[in-house]
């Protein structure tokens, strides 16, 4: 009976795999290879989500996640983060995400935090506190809003991408610099634009350049992250993304560092990760990880994490430190 209930819960809560189809989404199709890659990523995310929704406990989901193809496993952990956060946000939900992060999911902590943001996009706002309770890292919590922004751009593309909607007075996190929330959401929208544009750098850049100039730095950062972590682009296309970004190429590189660091931490570095990190950032994935770690430590040492509406969170200082660190590498003899 219990297994029947878990299967029913999975059927009720899990979106159809068709939701990852580029044609269903109305996304640009660059070529069959890119389409296959992007759709496989979406399907793997939904698989991880389903594992979490159906699991008796996080350890059971972890065992199944570890059996998935390694190069896509990070997306499955992201989906599982969403699934467990949805369960935490429901009545009598529990603390599934916290328990999940005590295992192998800690290697994918960036992805799990992003998954929490997906869950928030699906839950009523009065459930957000429960769903996001495990996002206790004061720096990484902004990745939750990155996930929220990705979800909105992926599933509500016309409103958030083509009509460039921006949510006013975003209420989460309650104790963070209020004005920064929209920037973190834009970083997620930029990540989604890589998918909306079918991993075509010209299409992605055209979509980003249609936004107000004040938003483009964060959007290009997200695109750089997706181009490095998700891929589906060759060397010439990665160079085209950097060229089209123009003055925002440092932000593309910063996003690439985040992606390289995330894959290196999880032990999921692919040949594409190395290629993209080198072309967009000028570093190896291991160097990206080292730079991310040292930059975060420096940011935390100089930030009091002000809570006022005009404050700059440590997360943003971290991103700026990465940009300056890359600049120093370029000028070093």
Please identify what each model-predicted range represents.
Residues 1-333:
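Mature, well-folded catalytic/scaffold domains that follow N-terminal targeting or propeptide regions
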